[in-house]
Curated annotation (Swiss-Prot):
Signal peptide: 1-18
Subcellular location(s) per record: Secreted; Host cell membrane
Natural source organism: Plasmopara viticola (Downy mildew of grapevine)
Domain of life per record: Eukaryota
Protein name from the UniProt record: Secreted RxLR effector protein 154
UniProt similarity note: Belongs to the RxLR effector family.
Short sequence motif RxLR-dEER: positions: 49-64
Keywords: Host cell membrane, Host membrane, Membrane, Secreted, Signal, Virulence
Keyword Secreted: yes
Primary role: Secreted effector that completely suppresses the host cell death induced by cell death-inducing proteins.
Swiss-Prot/TrEMBL domain comment: The RxLR-dEER motif acts to carry the protein into the host cell cytoplasm through binding to cell surface phosphatidylinositol-3-phosphate.
GO cellular component: extracellular region; host cell plasma membrane; membrane
C-alpha cells in the first residue's frame, strides 16, 4: 500500500515539472517574437540557389533593377529636352537664313540694275561682253522698273541686236567674227574688261561639266559667251560639228525661252 502511494507521488511530481517547463518555453517564445527563424534554402536544377522574397540579396537585386530601369527613363527625358532645344535653334536659324537670302537677293537685283545701267551707257557691246542677255534684261528690269513701256522698248531693241549675232551661224564660221569682239574688248575701260573676262571664265567653267541645254538655260548662260568659249577652245578651227550643233540648238532654245518668259 505504501509502495503505491510512493509511485503516485512521483507521478505527480514529474507531471508538475513537465507542465512547468512547458509554460516557461511558451513564455520565452512570446518574449522574443523578432528572432529570425532558420531559412530553408531552395536550389534549382542547375545548382543555383533560389532567392526567397524576404532574402536580403533578393531585395538588393530588385533595388538594382529599379535603378537600372530609371536610368534609361532619365536619359530619355534628357534627350527629349535636348531635341526641343535643337528644334528651336533650327527654326531660328531657318528664319535667319531666309532673311539673309532675301536681303542678298534684293541686293543682287539692285546691283544688276546699276550694272546694266552703267553698261548701257557704253553701248550694247559692253553689256553683251559682260554676260548680260535678253533674259537678264527682261527678268531684272521687268520686276523692278515702274515704266513698263520704256522697258519694253529697250528690251525689244536689245533682244533684236543680240540675236542678230547668230544669224550667220549656219553660213559663216563664227571664228571669222571673233576678232571683232576681241577688238571691242580692248576699247573698253579696264574695269569693264575685267568684268567681261570674269563672265567668260564663268561660262567656260560651266561648259566643262558638259551641261544640257535645259541646264544652261536655267543658269542663264550667255549664248554669245558660249560661242566665244567654243572659239577659245578651238572648236571652230577644228570644225567640231557636235559642239557647233549644240551651240545652234542652244541659241534656238534660248530665244524661244526668252519669248515665253
Amino acid at each position: 500500500m505504501r509502495r503505491c502511494a510512493l509511485l503516485f507521488r512521483l507521478f505527480l511530481i514529474s507531471y508538475s515539472c513537465s507542465v512547468y517547463f512547458s509554460a516557461c518555453t511558451q513564455a520565452s517564445s512570446l518574449k522574443e517574437p523578432d528572432e529570425e527563424l532558420p531559412r530553408a534554402e531552395q536550389w534549382d536544377d542547375n545548382g543555383k540557389r533560389i532567392l526567397q522574397a524576404d532574402d536580403p540579396e533578393h531585395i538588393r537585386t530588385e533595388e538594382r533593377g529599379i535603378t537600372q530601369n530609371l536610368k534609361p527613363a532619365a536619359e530619355s527625358i534628357g534627350k527629349v529636352k535636348a531635341a526641343g532645344k535643337a528644334i528651336k535653334t533650327s527654326v531660328l536659324n531657318s528664319k535667319l537664313m531666309n532673311w539673309v537670302k532675301t536681303a542678298l537677293r534684293k541686293g543682287y537685283t539692285a546691283w544688276q540694275l546699276v550694272k546694266m545701267y552703267s553698261l548701257s551707257k557704253g553701248g550694247g557691246v559692253s553689256a553683251m561682253m559682260s554676260g548680260i542677255t535678253p533674259l537678264t534684261y527682261k527678268t531684272v528690269y521687268g520686276r523692278t522698273i515702274a515704266s513698263k513701256v520704256d522697258v519694253k522698248e529697250k528690251f525689244d531693241t536689245f533682244k533684236t541686236e543680240y540675236f542678230k549675232l547668230f544669224e550667220d551661224l549656219d553660213n559663216v564660221k563664227p571664228s571669222s567674227g571673233m576678232q571683232y569682239w576681241d577688238d571691242e574688248l580692248k576699247k573698253l575701260p579696264w574695269t569693264r574688261q575685267f568684268t567681261a573676262r570674269l563672265a567668260l571664265n564663268k561660262v567656260r567653267k560651266i561648259l566643262k561639266s558638259d551641261p544640257s541645254v535645259e541646264k544652261m538655260i536655267d543658269l542663264n548662260v550667255s549664248p554669245l559667251l558660249y560661242m566665244r568659249a567654243l572659239e577659245k577652245q578651238g572648236a571652230f578651227a577644228r570644225n567640231d560639228v557636235a559642239a557647233i550643233n549644240k551651240l545652234k540648238d542652244y541659241v534656238k532654245a534660248f530665244k524661244k525661252h526668252v519669248d515665253l518668259a
